[in-house]
Amino acid sequence: MSATKLDGNLYRDEIFEDLAQRVAALKEKGITPGLATVLVGDDPGSHSYVKMKHRDCEKLGINSIRKDLPADVSQEELERVIEELNNDDACTGYIVQLPLPKHLDENRVLELIDPAKDADGLHPINLGKLVLNEEAPLPCTPNGCIHLLRRFGVELDGAKVVIIGRGVTVGRPIGLMLTRRSENSTVTLCHTGTKDLAAETREADVIIAAAGKAHMLTADMVKEGAAVLDVGVSRVDGKLAGDVAEDVWEKAGYVSPNPGGVGPLTRAFLVSNIVERAEKLAAQ
């Protein structure tokens, strides 16, 4: 068998069509949402990704503000930029592209973001609200994962889901989201301390690979017909590579390509968070 392709580009276009209508309605009220990005350093992948986010904004009629900083930027200067965006009424919400260079205090930077403007849903307050099941901006990549699975009819209620990777952007928050009553999945979070990863993944109905280790998930680790999301990003010979090996496509029932799977939906739900906040401001 050959797995069904979980095509994020197709679903992204559906979401963008809805967002474009909502942005147009906001503009009729004199409100134009604005998304800002803060990018530190010259990583080609990060620059490409941020460029796509601004292209999305242009397509949808959303203002975009880009703050590109050198790799050796000081903590003080970065914090000044964060404060500037917190106070900028033209900025509905913004993201700090992660990871940051090691000399910068990433947690401190995330804490300084105005939680209401946290377009990535990664501020400690917003993650805390996720734990408490309170309304807050949701982390974009986990939200994209769940919507992609639902869009293609993958059952989550009662499903055994194995997550590989415990990073703050995907692994930790998606476990919280999948155990909400709206998803009702049974979640196992695997990481470098997991003694027998293959034993866990072979029992999974859904596998979310977010380890950042190229091609680490192979066909012998996957149950026949399982759904597999490839969220990991690493580099092999200078090229971007996902966590899922090619042979998984012949055994799984559903596989998201990388790129072209979850990534487009990460961007879609980033913009969605901005539009939702603009709508709330308009209703005040």
From Swiss-Prot:
It comes from Corynebacterium aurimucosum (strain ATCC 700975 / DSM 44827 / CIP 107346 / CN-1). This is Bifunctional protein FolD. One of its GO terms (biological process) is L-histidine biosynthetic process. Its EC number is 1.5.1.5, 3.5.4.9. Homodimer. The gene is folD. Keywords: Amino-acid biosynthesis, Histidine biosynthesis, Hydrolase, Methionine biosynthesis, Multifunctional enzyme, NADP, One-carbon metabolism, Oxidoreductase, Purine biosynthesis. Gene3D superfamilies: Leucine Dehydrogenase, chain A, domain 1, NAD(P)-binding Rossmann-like Domain. GO terms for cellular component: cytosol. CDD domains: NAD_bind_m-THF_DH_Cyclohyd. One of its GO terms (molecular function) is methylenetetrahydrofolate dehydrogenase (NADP+) activity. The lineage of its organism: Bacteria, Bacillati, Actinomycetota, Actinomycetes, Mycobacteriales.
